[in-house]
Amino acid sequence: MPGSGTSTFIDPDDYQASLDRVPLDLLLVTSRGEFKASVTSARLNHLYLLRSEEDFPRVAYISLSPALVFVGFPGRSSPPIVWGGVELHPGEIVLHSSAERFHQRTAGPCSWGLIGLASAQFERYSKTLTGKALTAPAAGRVLWPAARNSARLLRLFTQACRLAQTRPKILGHPEVARGLEQGIIHALMTCLRSTRVKCNGPATQDRQQILMRFEDVLADRLGGLLRMSELCALTGVNERTLRSCCAEFLGISPSRYVLLRRLKQAHTALRDGDRATVSVGEIARACGFTELGRFARAYQTVFGETPLTTLRRPPGSGPTSPIFTDPA
């Protein structure tokens, strides 16, 4: 059943949780200040549309649903967005692989969009409109369609999102939803049919796989002692390579990324914890911190308050200071 909606967020965790079809396994905001983002989504018959507008630089680790074929792109006037280590400029699009995992990094206020189409429908429409049944590629591709084709796709996408934001009920009418959907699908297939592939090169794909192994190691070992030498060994690369990949994809060093992931994990546990049954020390140790004084100082630097203050605060209240990083 067609549906749509728009929401505004001042808390990074709430924003992260709202992207149900685009699971953000991790969202680290990389600037001080009051976080603000808005999300507009439209669910038509076979299409899922999402437009996000964000005020602050951040890095996200994203896992796409295998049920849909996704195409992503920056907004018309958005600064470059780094998708999987590659700068994406207005007019370019990403055709994602099935269930793709990747990092997305922004350097400032930006907007970006995502179109999801059920795999079977993607194959059927592509065969009808291009003469060739297309499927999600084995690896994500950055494409460079003709300017008029990408402009048409963005215009129709923006039109649908504007209706979802200002007149959401109208998208509940089957004829309106069907007309918008057909126009967007046709524009999308035109972009995919007549396009140039932006050369990423196998080296970029290899480096992306290094980052995925890095994330797998962190998912398994984040709560334990993890020295740089061990992290490199488990990832299967030397320290120089890991540092280079993290700088390219994440914009920060591996050690800084690990610290911020642990602090975010601790922040979530403290925010949701019951102070009658859990202590700051227990949470800190569970998140891999062995020196409580150093943990408390790092936590306060990032979140603007002590860990105990977060634990004592009633759920849903208090400041929403985002995580920030320095270039270390």
Predicted regions and their residues:
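Short hydrophobic/aromatic patch on the recognition helix
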Residues: 242, 246, 294-295, 299
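Short, conserved glycine- and acidic-residue-centered signature motifs
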Residues: 64, 207, 259
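N-terminal low-complexity or simple alpha-helical regulatory segments
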Residues: 1-67, 72-73
